[in-house]
Amino acid sequence: MKNLEPKEAYAYLQSHPEAVFIDCRSEIEYLFVGHPAGAIHIAWQDSPDWDVNPDFLGHMRIAASVNRPVVLICRSGRRSADAGRYLEKHGFPEVYNVAHGFEGDMDEARHRSTRNGWRHDGLPWEQT
């Protein structure tokens, strides 16, 4: 799995229309915090227990198949990295992780979207 900075991921998605962009955050994050424009939501973990979604692999096989590149994003890049390693173990050969995720790393005041991340970098996003 390769890590891409948010702007690199955006450029990759623009130049590879066959790639599938997956937001693997929880449903609440996806709906209320906002999400990258064009991303498909398939939660890796979700509330209330935050267990790995037992349907994740099945949903991914429907959305992407193992023949298409997959770009994963979460809040900070950690859950999407876990999901990416899981996909690689299950036969997905071309998986990319968006480093720093949608909201980015926390600053000294414990706020996100102030240092890095998809939203911080001014990339297209929307809120439902």
PLM region spans:
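Rhodanese-like catalytic fold shared by cysteine-dependent sulfurtransferases
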Residues: M1-A19, E27-P69, S80-T128
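Short, surface-exposed ligand- or partner-binding patches at beta-edge/loop junctions that are enriched
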Residues: L72-I73
